Structures are given as C-alpha cells and as structure tokens.
C-alpha cells in the first residue's frame, strides 16, 4: 500500500494488506491516515509499503515532469562493507549497488509508463559502483572507476536525468562523489547551460550524523571491524575532519540544484532516525521520509508524531529537536533487519523520482540553489529527558504563531492520538509521561 504526498513522512510495508488502487481497495484505517497526513497518489503495483507525509497544500507541483527526458544515468552506490560477523546486522554490500540500480530503473520505468512516456532500453544506463574502504578512499576509487569507464562517463555526461541510489556509509560517499563530478564539470548544473541536467539523490538509512552512540563501545565493533567502521562514529561530531568534508560536499550539491530524498528506517539497529534524515541540515531541496516495517506499523500517537515532525521539516518548519529525542527509543534490535530491508521497498525509489520530477511550485530556482544551513551537531550518549516536552511546546507555539490552519488541525489530531495512546513498553510509557505536562499546549 502506498499513500504518498509531495514531501513524504512515513514509509511502511504492510505485508498482506491490499495496496491502494484506483478502485479504492484500502482499509478505513489507512484512508484516515492518508486524509490526515496529505494527498493520496495511487500506485498499481501490489507493494509492501505506505508513504504518508506532507506537502505544502498551498502550492501545486511544477508541470515539467518527464519533459525533456531522453537519456538517463542511474548510479548505485553500496554502503560500508562489513566483515562476516556483522553482515546479519548491516546487510550484504556485494551486489547491492546493482540492486539499487535495478530497483531505481524499475521505479523509473513505472513512473514513465504512468505518464505515457517510453524510453528505449539503451537510453537508460545503469552504473553500479563498488569499492571498499573509508569514505574518502571510496570517493577516489569510485571516481576513478567511473571516469575510466568511457561508456559510463559518456552516459553520465549525456544524461538529461541523473539518479543516484545509495545506502548507509554510501551516503557521504555519494555526496562527495557527486560534488566532485559537479566541480569538475562532468555534471552540468549551471542554469545558463541549455543542457542542464536534473539530478536526484536517494539516501537510504544514510549515516549522515553517525550510528547510534551506544554502539561505539560495543565489543563486536571494536574487535571485528577496522578503520572504515570506526570512521562512521566521526560523523557524530560535525567538527570532525570527515564531517567537515561531508558538509562541504553537501553545500556544493545542494547549492547546485540537486534534489535529495532522505529515507530513514524506523527500527534501524545501526543508524538513528535523526542521522538518516540529516536533522541538522536545512534546505528546501531535501525531502525526508521514514520506512516502517509492516510488523511494527501502528496508527498510534508515536508513529503520527514522527510523521508530523517530518512533515514540518519538509515544509521548512523547525521540529525543535523532536526527531533527535525520539530516535533512541525507536532503535531496532541489534540482529534485526531494519537497516537493510529498506532498500527492498520499490516505493522508496518511486518517492525519490516523484520528489525530483514533481517539485512543489514553491521550490523556485532561487530557493533550490540557496546555500544550505548547516547547524553544528554532536551526538550525545544520554539526552536530557526533560527536553522532549519543551520541544513539543516549541512546535505548538510555532504552529499557532504561523496561524496555518492545516497544521493546527494536524496538531489537534496529534493531541487526540496522545489522549487515546496506551503504550505497553516501558520506553513508550516514559515518553507519554514526559509529554503529560505539555498536553494542554497540544
């Protein structure tokens, strides 16, 4: 089932639930969720997922869509290559670059078919880039692999549409690689260039702000894994050398008009929600979403609060740190599959295509090429539990000050869900207890 909006908030596979279709075959539960969280885009493919989130309802999508698309280059870039001991946690990287290319290719063809546009097979070139190591080592290796392959380089240079799909450690690797391609003129991003390319990057469970801090001292990481794994924790501090390099790359990419879709996995056992959605980075060309495993989906207060917070970020409204403070409690079991199952969901790829080809009218050229705001960030082992109600109060005050009736109604709905919420686990009960003082503000 897929419920989608211009800027997405929630992605969840729903197992045997009948997918949404033009005939309206969907449970009332999800009709309600769709109505509350945004517009509905039906898809014909029986899927595992639901995408619900936000759009700026005062705007409409720009009409360009598939116009001018004659050639496409799809780059797939896998994440960190773990040793055997951790592959059940991280997932198998070998072949995932090809999988990302294949899934993006299928999603694109489905999208083009919906818009009565057909490209010849040779006009879509898939470029699976593979190579291990630390981030900067990988950037150099993948760059050389790309430019030395004349067919791949030509495909990238001649493409009207460039799509990138990446996962985990592949996120900073991809951003730095794309920044280099932009700086060297291999990618054409100048507005005065009649052959300017449209470029979209899909990051899945990206490790932009590092893994969960509590993983740093784990025996399995310290003993079995080497420099590439330890480097991931350097992203927890925005002042580290590699984090500064990454932010320079983000600045280049986002100010060049590249559209980014950042999808987290709700029960990720490695990458926290705030890290995957780049919570400290602010730019109108970033669309944020979260993937929820079907067995974990509940239409309750917490899920809707996360979706609501993502909706705010997608509309350019501050979430007042809520996503950071909800991330730890949503961590998946260490040997679960939340970190790797995200890239099996086709609609995650479809979301990134829609985000690129159907931007809101409010995303003007000037805004899409503005400098990103890169707030300092440092992950903490322990968070102040009393910050959560202040964050919620901040959201409520900002929404009321804006006077946005759509958001005010959303806030009222969140309050009703809070009142009806009867959490079972200790962690969820603690969240409800912490938010009790701010109930009246909601």
Annotate each language-model stretch with its function:
Residues 1-61, 232-234, 241-255, 259, ...:
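Extended, polar/charged low-complexity intrinsically disordered and coiled-coil segments in eukaryotic
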Residues 9-46, 64-162, 204-231:
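Active-site catalytic motif of lipid deacylating hydrolases and related acyltransferases
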Residues 57-63, 192-195:
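Intrinsically disordered, low-complexity acidic Ser/Thr-rich regulatory segments
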Residues 72-76, 121-129, 201, 260-262, ...:
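Conserved beta-strand scaffold positions in the cores of enzyme catalytic domains, especially
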Residues 96-100, 104, 135-138, 142, ...:
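Alpha-helical interaction elements in eukaryotic regulators
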Residues 109, 144-151, 179-182, 353, ...:
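Alpha-helical repeat scaffolds in large eukaryotic proteins
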Residues 114-120, 192-194, 253:
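Short, conserved catalytic or adaptor-binding loops enriched in Gly and charged residues
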Residues 136-248, 254, 270, 277:
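Serine-dependent carboxylesterase/thioesterase catalytic core
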């Amino acid at each position: 089932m897929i419920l989608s909006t211009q800027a997405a908030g929630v992605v969840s596979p729903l197992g045997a639930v009948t997918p949404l279709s033009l005939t309206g075959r969907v449970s009332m539960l999800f009709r309600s969720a769709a109505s509350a969280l945004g517009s509905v885009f039906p898809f014909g493919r029986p899927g595992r997922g639901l995408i619900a989130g936000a759009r700026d309802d005062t705007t409409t999508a720009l009409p360009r869509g598939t116009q001018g698309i004659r050639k496409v280059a799809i780059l797939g870039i896998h994440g960190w290559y773990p040793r055997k001991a951790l592959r059940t946690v991280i997932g198998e990287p070998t072949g995932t670059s090809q999988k990302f290319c294949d899934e993006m290719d299928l999603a694109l063809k489905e999208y083009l078919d919906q818009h009565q546009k057909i490209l010849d097979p040779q006009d879509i070139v898939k470029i699976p880039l593979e190579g291990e190591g630390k981030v900067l080592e990988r950037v150099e290796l993948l760059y050389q692999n790309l430019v030395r392959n004349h067919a791949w380089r030509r495909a990238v240079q001649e493409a009207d549409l460039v799509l990138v799909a990446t996962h985990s450690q592949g996120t900073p690797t991809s951003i730095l690689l794309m920044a280099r391609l932009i700086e060297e003129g291999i990618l054409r991003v100048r507005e005065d260039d009649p052959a300017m390319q449209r470029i979209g990057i899909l990051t899945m469970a990206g490790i932009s702000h590092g893994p969960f801090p509590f993983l740093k001292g784990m025996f399995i990481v310290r003993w079995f894994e080497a420099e590439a794994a330890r480097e991931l924790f350097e992203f927890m501090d925005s002042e580290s050398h590699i984090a500064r390099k990454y932010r320079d790359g983000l600045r280049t990419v986002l100010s060049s008009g590249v559209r980014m879709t950042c999808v987290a996995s709700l029960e990720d056992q490695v990458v926290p929600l705030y890290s995957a959605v780049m919570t400290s980075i602010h730019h109108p060309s970033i669309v944020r979403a979260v993937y929820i495993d079907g067995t974990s989906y509940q239409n309750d207060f917490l899920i809707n609060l996360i979706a609501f917070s993502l909706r705010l970020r997608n509309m350019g409204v501050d979430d007042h740190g809520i996503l950071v403070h909800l991330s730890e409690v949503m961590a998946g079991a260490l040997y679960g599959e939340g970190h790797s199952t995200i890239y099996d969901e086709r609609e995650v790829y479809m979301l990134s295509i829609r985000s690129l080809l159907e931007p809101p009218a409010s995303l003007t050229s000037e805004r899409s090429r503005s400098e990103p705001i890169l707030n300092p960030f440092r992950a903490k082992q322990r968070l102040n539990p009393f910050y959560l109600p202040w964050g919620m109060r901040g959201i409520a005050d900002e929404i009321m000050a804006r006077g946005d009736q759509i958001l005010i109604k959303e806030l009222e709905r969140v309050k009703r869900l809070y009142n009806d919420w009867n959490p079972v686990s200790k962690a969820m009960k603690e969240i409800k207890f912490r938010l009790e003082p701010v109930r009246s503000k909601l």
